[in-house]
Structure formats: structure tokens, C-alpha cells
Curated annotation (Swiss-Prot):
Catalyzes the ferrous insertion into protoporphyrin IX. One of its GO terms (cellular component) is mitochondrion. It is found in: Mitochondrion inner membrane. NCBIfam families: hemH (TIGR00109). The active site is at D351. CDD domains: Ferrochelatase_C, Ferrochelatase_N. It is a peripheral membrane protein. GO terms for molecular function: ferrochelatase activity. Its EC number is 4.98.1.1. This is Ferrochelatase, mitochondrial.
Amino acid sequence: MLSRTIRTQGSFLRRSQLTITRSFSVTFNMQNAQKRSPTGIVLMNMGGPSKVEETYDFLYQLFADNDLIPISAKYQKTIAKYIAKFRTPKIEKQYREIGGGSPIRKWSEYQATEVCKILDKTCPETAPHKPYVAFRYAKPLTAETYKQMLKDGVKKAVAFSQYPHFSYSTTGSSINELWRQIKALDSERSISWSVIDRWPTNEGLIKAFSENITKKLQEFPQPVRDKVVLLFSAHSLPMDVVNTGDAYPAEVAATVYNIMQKLKFKNPYRLVWQSQVGPKPWLGAQTAEIAEFLGPKVDGLMFIPIAFTSDHIETLHEIDLGVIGESEYKDKFKRCESLNGNQTFIEGMADLVKSHLQSNQLYSNQLPLDFALGKSNDPVKDLSLVFGNHEST
């Protein structure tokens, strides 16, 4: 009886000691986090005009980007002004038709905030984590965000590309712009940067898309559900960019394949491409053309915007109002919900950032080749200038 009492008391003391130790550890980490400068988690994207009146500035910034549209730097700004002025009335009308502006800033700020909340709990060694958004062509521009980070005393930051699939014209452009702002605003290198430059097969990304597709399939009549064609639609690229060896098409295809694997290849599917403009050859097949071709031949068709992490004009207007809304087969067509505030997706983002922070890897092993192949008038000559010495893991 006495020995049992002693064992019970000993077990109680050990559990109490463990609880106190854990409590002390959490308190100690929280106190340390309060003393540390914040780790900036910066979601990089192209952005979009939050208000209709911001449309011209957005278009000008876009057409003036030599990484996106590689033409003679001597004439680019003049041409950008002309094209932006010409296209503004049409694009303003489209933004009015989807509610008066792009929702991309709203969703990006929400995603960044939620990711940082999770990271403060799961990755206390780099806490506190502070959310930022840096857009390439709309407010808040990279320069504006960088100035705010300096004011906030950020010493370490992760540039988190919201293009899951690398292209020199998108993620590459954001990195080049980051380098320009480092030179202009932070020559003493107050902030130490690393980058998540691609994540096409991230588990949370794949799972979130799979969940959304499965949910949307339930809206089709049961007899045709397994026959519904899944059209994965990504923003197209000019073929002259594709022919440089740009990684984008292969990485988009990797995402699609992983999703279909998750769904056990139950439905027929295709990868198609949207948003091409101008007379130059673009990567195809084109979303709208394939949809109209398949319309009379299939029992149902679902559009999945695969290269976007939230809704914006390409989903809300081009697909919803254009491809679906103007089709005579619209009764057969549905669009899968975008990722937006999907909790599975946000948790996947947080896991990705946590792994990145703990790896001490500054950028992926693919990035130097991406920049060697990319074409630009003002590129980063050496990635170590932006991110320091690359330590491969």
C-alpha cells in the first residue's frame, strides 16, 4: 500500500514538473518573441486595382514592366502610357461589373494575417511574425511595403511568392523589383531576405483544390457527376517566353497532375490557358475555345482557376461573366471556388513558411537557372546580392 502511494505521488510529481516545464517554455518563448524584431512574411503578387480609379496606374505599371513585356527600354514607358490609356476604359468597365475593383488585396491581406497567426504558435523561434503584402503593379507597391517594414524594425523577411508556379515574368519580376528597392531604400541591408519562389506541389495547395473540386462536383446531377470534364485554367504565356525554357508550364502541369492523383483520376480533365492578348502566339489550348468546342459534347464542365491563389478579374470577369456567362451551354458549366480564405490552403501556406524558415535555405536550387534563362533589361546579376550566400539543403 505504501509503495503504491509513493509511486502514485512520484508519477504526479513528474507530470506536474513536465507541465511546469512546458508552461515555462511557452512563457519564455513568448517573452523572447516580444523582445525580438518581427519576422516579415511578405506575400508578393501582381496585385489589382482595389478601386476603379486605380485602373490606369495599374495598367501603366504592368505594361512598363520589362520582365513581363521585354521590349526596348528606350520606348517602353512611352508605349506603356499609350496602351494603358487605350485599355483603361474597357478594363474600368470590367472592374465595375465585378463590384468596383479587384478583391486580390483583401484576400492577400487576410491570407497573410492568418498565416502569421499560425506561425506565431507553430514556429515560436522566429516569432513574432508580421504580415505584409507587396504588389508589383498596384497598391501597396513593393517600395511602399519596404518603407513600412523598415519603420516596423523588421530584420528578417520571407518574400513569399503568391505565384505557386515560377515564371520569370511574374516571380522573377517581383524579385528584380525587390532588388531595386533594396538598392534604393536599404543600402545598409537592414533586412535579411529569403524567398519562397515556387510551391506547385505543396500539400495544402493540392488538398485545398481537391476539396473545392469535390464540393463543386456535388452541384452536378448524380448520374453525370463522374463524367464532368475538369478544365484546369491557368494564365497563358507568350510562346517566345515559353521558348526561353521558362519553368511555368511544367510547374502548372505538376499541380494539375497532383490534384488528379489526389482525386484518383475519377474525372476526365485537361489543362487549358486563358487571358492571352495581342497578335503574338500564346501557349494554348485556349480556355474559351475548348469550352465552346466541348459544350455540346459533354454532360458537364467545371473550370478550375489553377494558377491563382484568390479571385480577381480573370476569374470573376473573364471566366464567370465571359466564358460561362456568354456561352449557350452555360447550364452545363460551373466554376470551382477559388482558394481565397480556404482554411486548408492557409494552413498549407503556414506549413510551407515554417519549413522554409527552419531550413535556412535562402531560395530554391532552381532559381539560378531561372534567372540565367530569363530576359530583362534590368535583371539581378547575382542572386546573392538579394538573398546573401545560398546554402543548399
